[in-house]
Amino acid sequence: MAGCPKGSWKPRLRSVVLGAAQLIWLSALISELVNRKKVATWTYNYSTKAYSWNNSRAFCKRHFTDLVAIQNKNEIAHLNDVIPYVNSYYWIGIRKINNKWTWVGTNKTLTAEAENWADNEPNNKRNNQDCVEIYIKSNSAPGKWNDEPCFKRKRALCYTASCQDMSCNSQGERIETIGSYTCSCYPGFYGPECEYVQECGKFDIPQHVLMNCSHPLGDFSFSSQCTFSCPEGYDLNGPSEMQCLASGIWTNNPPQCKAVQCQSLEAPLHGTMDCTHPLAAFAYDSSCKFECQPGYRMRGSDILHCTDSGQWSEPLPTCEAIACEPLESPLHGSMDCFPSTGAFGYNSSCTFRCTEGFVLMGNDAIHCADLGQWTAPAPVCEALQCQEFPVPSKAQVSCSDPFGPLKYQSACSFSCDEGSLLVGASVIRCLATGHWSEAPPECQAVSCTPLLSPENGTMTCIQPLGHSNYKSTCQFMCDEGFYLSGPERLDCSPSGHWTGSPPMCEAIKCPEIFAPEQGSLDCSHVHGEFSVGSTCHFSCNEEFELLGSRNVECTVSGRWSAPPPTCKGVTSLPVPSVRCPALTTPGQGTMSCRHHLESFGPNTTCYFGCKTGFTLRGANSLRCGASGQWTAVTPVCRAVKCSELHMDTAVAMNCSNPWGNFSYGSTCAFHCPEGQSLNGSARTTCGEDGHWSDAMPTCQAGTLTIQEALTYLGGALASTSGLAVGGTLLALLRKRLRKKDDGKCPLNPHSHLGTYGVFTNAAYDPTP
């Protein structure tokens, strides 16, 4: 055990006898039979079964401390004396780790002094002998060690330690002896139980020094650490930190703070200097003011300060003879000065002029005045400006401007947008006269041949660039009863041609019809033979009767308004013996019937449909049979259903259901109890697609509930002075809590939304 160094083993032989009486009692506590031998403050244990080395160590750690750790010859002799002999011998707590024999309990390498190998051991047969056994009561090598493969099964030799974790105040190492222990204190601690900490003592803090200390073990004691710093404008001279060592001595002496020093200054030539030094000469916070003699001016700052970085706030100024700023010839121009020494001193004068294509901006002559300023700013030569021109419509302009936008030597290139043609010069230049070499060109749109609306149709055009010009788009539609023959849309392309030929509107045709047998046909055609608008009149020969419509018309759907009639002899007119019951249009639906002989007679066929929001239940067509019965039951139209709304305990719901509960057209309104607010939409409607227009809302509590008001009321009622206030609040709460009873009752599905109440979700469905 790492925290329990062992003491002398010589006096422990006797104590084994005292501990032997405990073996029988302990064996009943362990599921696997275990025998123990005690020696003073350690107990040795061994298993009665054989295990591999890993399982043996697991056995020891589960029941005791670990496999035994042997560190001297006396311990080996004692174990060989008290532990019984078994032919498989015992595993001990040594194993080869990283090719070194190691005590597994402490993870320390086996020292040469502690080795107790048998002769010619360890030999590492087959390169897998990484664990160690002890020969207990061996005739040839009693108590000696041997390396063995770890998978072999041997008895586990264990020990139990009795050290206490808090011994020696956790500031030293406990050395156990028989029935007692001593403490070996760690550096910096002393005393029988290592209870005292070595002190270094306090020290004086020099002036201006800032100190911050930490004392983990006591003021100015072992492990105390102090850090030092200086205020702004001071440098630390000495160590920045000190530590109290285990010997009770500080690692260094305290440092000192010295004012930051700047470089010494002198008055400039032809000038004076006046300085103030609050701390030391030319040190932090010193300041110096400079002035120049008459006829000279100062170049630089007239006041300098010594900063905390040890640098002056500005460079040392100089005094120079009054002169004007040096001048240079203007770009694209020239300059002549007098005198020509180049000093630009007082009363110097300079004249300026510009090269061709440039004009002088400013005075052509300036003088250096007595204050060192020129009488006017130096002029500049600017390129002549050509007049700005408007960018032609549908044109792109790209200019190169070496001397500025639209100035001398500027060149502008023109190009036209797609669908436009350039008329004029493609490039114009700004000349030295300030005029353009050419007039700006124009872009004229490409035009296509104008189109006309087709006969019996219409044409709608979008012409962003002008009538029938490029990018014009024309859409064509035909009047009712006509269809488009050709493209529905034409575009004017950049080449000036339409993308196709103009379409035509042709009349919709109906199937050709003929005169009935024993009859005649007379037709008139407005838009062509048997086309939309054509009408035909039928008649029968004498002695024959017309059955069907006498007049039919070709409709826009391409069908005749009625089937062609027939002619039957008068004496042989059929008298139908049976008829089917007359049908009626279903509610919210449509019905269209075709009667073969007479209304609802044999072979009459009726077709059914429903309005928006309703679906057909049943067959969509019925035919009257020869027996006078329809082929199916008359269908009905049922409203589309939405999902059922489930009411929250707090939400009140009021619904109107014109076509059934939660069906198409149902509208539900929501409101919350007094004191709560609605979170969401206050109304939702069932749509034709079977979905609600809005999600169902919820109720959330307001800022003050009745219970909270009662809580606040309790404090007022608790005192005599609060009785009046409490009585008023109780009256208000009673009024608020009084259940409203205006003779209102739960609503049924047909209740109007304005009716007060709560929808009871009664079972209402008008369908059979």
Swiss-Prot record:
Glycosylated position list: 45, 54, 107, 212, 347, 456, 603, 654, 661, 679
Lipidation feature positions (S-stearoyl cysteine): 745
Disulphide connectivity of cysteines: 60-158, 131-150, 168-183, 185-194, 200-244, 230-257, 262-306, 292-319, 324-368, 354-381, 386-430, 416-443, 448-492, 478-505, 510-554, 540-567, 580-624, 610-637, 642-686, 672-699
Residue ranges of every copy of the Sushi domain listed in the record: 198-259, 260-321, 322-383, 384-445, 446-507, 508-569, 578-639, 640-701
Stored InterPro entries: C-type_lectin-like, C-type_lectin-like/link_sf, C-type_lectin_CS, Compl-Cell_Adhes-Reg, CTDL_fold, EGF-like_dom, Selectin_CTLD, Selectin_superfamily
SUPFAM superfamilies: C-type lectin-like, Complement control module/SCR domain, EGF/Laminin
Biological processes annotated in GO: calcium-dependent cell-cell adhesion via plasma membrane cell adhesion molecules; cell-cell adhesion; heterophilic cell-cell adhesion via plasma membrane cell adhesion molecules; inflammatory response; leukocyte cell-cell adhesion; leukocyte migration; leukocyte tethering or rolling; positive regulation of cell adhesion
Tissue distribution: Not detected in the absence of exposure to lipopolysaccharide (LPS). Detected only after exposure to lipopolysaccharide (LPS) in the tissues examined: spleen, lung, brain, liver, heart, kidney, thymus and small intestine.
Designated name of the protein: P-selectin
Organism for this UniProt entry: Rattus norvegicus (Rat)
